[in-house]
Every structure is written in C-alpha cells, then in structure tokens.
Amino acid sequence: ASDVYKRQVQMNPYDEKNSEPNFWLSCMLIDKDAMCQQVRGEQKALYISEPGKSCPTEILETLAKYNAEGRPIWKPMHEQPIFRMNPFITREGNGRAKTNAYIEGGSEDVGMDIFERGLCLPSDNKMTAEEQDQIIEIIKSCFM
C-alpha cells in the first residue's frame, strides 16, 4: 500500500483562534494517484479494486458493511439532467466551450473532479473519538 495512506486522515486547516467549527459534515477527496478505476452513472457505479488504491464507491460500500452511512459528494448542478446542456462558468469562461478545437487548453471542471474523487463521510457532531477512529480505520483498509 502507498505510504501516504499509512498515515492518519488529515483535516483541512482552519483558524482555531477565531472560529468555532461544529464539524457536522465531513467529506474527503482521494488523491488522483490513489484512485482505482471507477465509472458513475445516474443510478449505479462500477469500480475495479486495485491494491493500494480505492475510490468513493468502494469506500461507501465498505462503510455500509459496518452500518456506517456515507454518501457521494453532491453532483454538480451543471451535470444534473435538467441542466446538463446549459452553460456553466469556469475560470476560463464557459465550461461547455471546452470541446472547441480552436480553443487551446480548455477548462478544468473542478466540480466534476470533486464529485468523481470525493465522498461525504459518516458525520455527526456527537461522534466520539473512538467512532471517528473506527471510520478512519475502515477507510484506510480500503487502500490496502
């Protein structure tokens, strides 16, 4: 397994001095090089399990075996069926224009990248440290 995933799950930094977060919703994003192959459709998802790698679908299925409820990250609005053909804005302008052969580079669809690599973890502001550690261990086991 990758040495990266032998470490604990890391939190995003926040201003401890000037904020009082409640951590009611915890999400994670899998590094691109640690993702196994995954395809998500409207209703189903498929993946190919690989040693040292995982994906949101595999992690969610594994958590469910332990009666721990997670869910996929919310699908970006511009990918919802009702809005799929509408324009959306990126740093580079209209995200729908990225297939134009005359535009160099194209735009990065950050929302879809987060959707493909992210998931919402079992979350509750009353979770104990022991429960959190159990979730972390389950997630780490997916990368073995």
Give the role of each language-model region.
Residues 2-144:
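PLP-dependent aminotransferase class I/II
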